[in-house]
Amino acid sequence: MTAPETLFESSLSSLRLKARGKVRDIYEAGDDLMLIVTTDRLSAFDVILPDPIPGKGRVLTRVSRFWFERLKDRVPNHLSGTPLEAVLPDPAEREQVEGRAMVVKRLRPLPVEAVVRGYLIGSGWKDYQRSGAVCGIGLPSGLRLAERLPDALFTPSTKAEMGSHDENIGFDQVVGLIGRELAERMREVALGLYREAAAYALDRGIIIADTKFEFGVDEAGVLHWIDEALTPDSSRFWPADGYRPGISPPSFDKQFVRDYLETLEWDKKPPAPHLPPDILARTAEKYREAERRLTGE
């Protein structure tokens, strides 16, 4: 048997399914472990699209593993080191998720998205145009679209249910949710991870404009980096060679899909329309190109 080229939804009868997210299927794998399967599902405008992107889940898994390993000295992460066969002894089930599964520690997720912005783009640009600030953090006047910020900003948000939008919150609200010590640690770690990763990526021709981290804690209250790590899904990657402030750069992600969907008369509610083969292929290649540049593989 060979692993399937695309996987829209996993089916592992030997493990209890805990949750299906927009992209990931999460299974319980004993008292202290979970299995995260990254599928090829793609969401746009908070709606899951009906067509998988070939190989996307494997790219996201390899990129996450790369960053978890590279930045492990900054903060513990959720990787358990347990081999896949230890939780999936059935070869057929293992084959189904090979290359797209991670056996991780069971941790308590924190109810905050740790967003770090290094460039003025997206909702941050709209906020700045309106108020001269991003998420309440004042910035110098005269900054242009996509301009590098004087320093990276920690702009946390709530974790919304699937189908809803995250909402930006102030640091005091983070303190109210998880306590001051943990909030300050999260901010320090998120900014440190971003700065180191952004410098590394820039040397390889990629600008990390912004990214989203998720964290959890173990029973001792120790902060861990969980979920995914600096992937094209959780981050805005731009090619450095074409970067010019004042112009919105192309992204190494699902921009082809978003641009195509904007040409349709679709109300951005389920069910989503099917995607043409060329859009699927071009999107898959963008994900692979980001991986090649970052990891050299």
From Swiss-Prot:
Provide one Gene Ontology biological process annotation. Answer: 'de novo' IMP biosynthetic process
Tell me which EC number(s) this protein carries.
Answer: 6.3.2.6
Q: In which pathway does it act?
A: Purine metabolism; IMP biosynthesis via de novo pathway; 5-amino-1-(5-phospho-D-ribosyl)imidazole-4-carboxamide from 5-amino-1-(5-phospho-D-ribosyl)imidazole-4-carboxylate: step 1/2
State the Gene3D superfamilies in the record.
ATP-grasp fold, B domain, Phosphorylase Kinase, domain 1
* Highest taxon, organism lineage: Bacteria
- Read off the Pfam families from this record: SAICAR_synt
List, in alphabetical order, the Gene Ontology terms for molecular function in this entry.
ATP binding; phosphoribosylaminoimidazolesuccinocarboxamide synthase activity
Cellular component aspect of the GO annotation: cytoplasm
Keywords (A to Z) from UniProt? ATP-binding, Ligase, Nucleotide-binding, Purine biosynthesis
Q: Which reaction does it catalyse?
A: 5-amino-1-(5-phospho-D-ribosyl)imidazole-4-carboxylate + L-aspartate + ATP = (2S)-2-[5-amino-1-(5-phospho-beta-D-ribosyl)imidazole-4-carboxamido]succinate + ADP + phosphate + 2 H(+)
Q: Which family does it belong to?
A: Belongs to the SAICAR synthetase family.
Protein name, per record: Phosphoribosylaminoimidazole-succinocarboxamide synthase
- Say which species the protein is native to: Methylococcus capsulatus (strain ATCC 33009 / NCIMB 11132 / Bath)
Name of the encoding gene = purC
